[in-house]
Amino acid sequence: MLRLGVSRTPINRQFVGYEQRRHFIVASALTLGGFVFGKRAKLADAMENGELHNKNNDDEAIRKDRMDKRLKKLSETRPIKPRYEGHVPLYPHERMLLFAISGLKSFFHPEDGNNIVKLGESSAFPFVLESLKQCMLGDETGRRILREQPNITSDTLDMDRLKKMDKNSLGYTYYTWLITEGVSPDTRAPVKYIDDPLQAFIFKRYRQCHDFYHAINGLPIIIEGEIAIKALEAANMGIPMAALGALLAPLRLKPIQKERLYDIYLPWAIRTGLSCKPLINVYWEELLEKDVNELRKELGIQPPPNLRAIRQERSKIRKELKMKYDAYEVGM
């Protein structure tokens, strides 16, 4: 019995070795087959798409053609056909989901502009945009803006021209604000999720004019300045996203920032927004050479206290107090 038991060990080892070799051979064969047949499948797809014998080897054209096919296929699954370039129609449940997700992301990650953009469009309800349209139709300049549909970019504004304007002009004020803040008119995202083409333009116009509201009031793009401008927009134009930003964004601020907002900038924004001319009807591009102080008077805008100066003064005081405290500690 001992001999029989001992003689089984080499047999088992041989069997295990055979099984291991067999698995290795099978795995190798499957890998090789997948490579060969997978390559053949890719070749077949290329032949079907007419890409195998592309003598020009125009990869960019091929990618564009593929993208067009995907977009066409995607458009067939949408509730309506796209009505302007870049339009992405959404079902009601998709719009609600976009609103909820972008709203949460905007609250926890306000530094991500994409979230703000999506929240703005998903909350731009048709009745709000229709109200803005009626406001524009009731104003001569507003009607002309709707008719001409201008586009605010670095090229249309001619930045070289702006920097040569009079120091007190709107154009120079706007130009220096852009340089100071490190932004450009070209950074505004295109509208995608608003179905009506005219309403889409109105929202684009509101979005593109946002920096003029900053510049004419001397407010930086730091969070306190953004909240103040959002409150101004909400009071002046009734933009839901602006109202949400003005209400919820302060919850994440430091106590001293909240104090400045509630004591100075939010009261100013609401008072100014309710009393000044509807800003959606201002043709900013035609007023670039106008004296900025005269324009403020015409619009009914009185700029708030300089936010950067207030912050710098507080920072200076804190540094002086820290130096005195450190000197006291050394003296002890």
From Swiss-Prot:
Predominant place of localization: mitochondrion
Annotated catalysed reactions: a 4-hydroxy-3-methoxy-5-(all-trans-polyprenyl)benzoate + H(+) = a 2-methoxy-6-(all-trans-polyprenyl)phenol + CO2
Protein name: Ubiquinone biosynthesis protein COQ4, mitochondrial
Binding-site residues, Zn(2+): 210-211, 214, 226
Cross-referenced HAMAP family: Coq4
Transit peptide residues according to the UniProt entry: 1-24
Cofactor: Zn(2+)
Superkingdom to which the source organism belongs: Eukaryota
Listed GO biological process terms: ubiquinone biosynthetic process
Annotated GO CC locations: extrinsic component of mitochondrial inner membrane
Keywords associated with the record: Lyase, Membrane, Metal-binding, Mitochondrion, Mitochondrion inner membrane, Transit peptide, Ubiquinone biosynthesis, Zinc
Subcellular location: Mitochondrion inner membrane
Membrane topology, record value: Peripheral membrane protein
Quaternary assembly: Component of a multi-subunit COQ enzyme complex, composed of at least COQ3, COQ4, COQ5, COQ6, COQ7 and COQ9.
Pathways per UniProt: Cofactor biosynthesis; ubiquinone biosynthesis
Source organism of the structure: Zygosaccharomyces rouxii (strain ATCC 2623 / CBS 732 / NBRC 1130 / NCYC 568 / NRRL Y-229)
Family: Belongs to the COQ4 family.
Role noted for this protein: Lyase that catalyzes the C1-decarboxylation of 4-hydroxy-3-methoxy-5-(all-trans-polyprenyl)benzoic acid into 2-methoxy-6-(all-trans-polyprenyl)phenol during ubiquinone biosynthesis.
